[in-house]
Amino acid sequence: MTQRRSLTITSLGIAQTLAWASSYYLPAMLATSMARDLGISAPTVFLGFSLALVVSALLGPLAGQLIDRYGGRPVLAANSFIFAAGLAGLALAQGPLGMMIAWAVLGVAMAAGLYEAAFAALVHLYGKDARGAITGITLFAGFASTVGWPLSAWLELE
């Protein structure tokens, strides 16, 4: 394996770990606190998360088209800003509407930044030789809950 390929796998693996931890696994740790702070029920927080999943599913094909057209690097890099905007929106939400908008933004980020997009980028980059890279990234991101849950719990205390 070349040094460049190792760097790509490591970088995408870390990015995937953070993306999963800060999106998919986020409500598992923070839904109760979010609900309390926003004056809503925990199921309403999970409704917002469900909205993110629907948005992600609807925009997934578009994310794939963008990766096919422009390559994975610009799409995944730009998507980091969308993730940041969605997370900032959640942090700044003052009520259910703001929270729902933030979850919708996170849904956009999830469409263009989770496994499907990363794997499409690797296939675009390595073609038939992408299998090993995909496996490596999956192994990295498998630690998302291991990293995300304790980190979220710690951040919640701060």
Q: Which residues does each PLM region occupy?
A:
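Conserved MFS/SLC helix-loop-helix module at the cytosolic interface between two early adjacent transmembrane helices
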Residues: 58-97
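Extracytoplasmic
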Residues: 7-42, 59-63, 148-152
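Short hydrophobic/small-residue motifs within alpha-helical transmembrane segments
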Residues: 50-57, 142-144
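Intracellular juxtamembrane helix-capping segments at the cytosolic ends
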Residues: 34, 112-126
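Glycine-rich segments within core transmembrane alpha-helices of 12-TM secondary carriers
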Residues: 129-149
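Hydrophobic core of transmembrane alpha-helices in multi-pass small-molecule transporters
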Residues: 17, 86, 97-113, 138
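Juxtamembrane helix-start elements in MFS-like secondary transporters
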Residues: 40-49, 134
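Small-residue-rich segments within alpha-helical transmembrane domains of MFS-like 12-TM solute carriers
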Residues: 20-24, 107-116, 146
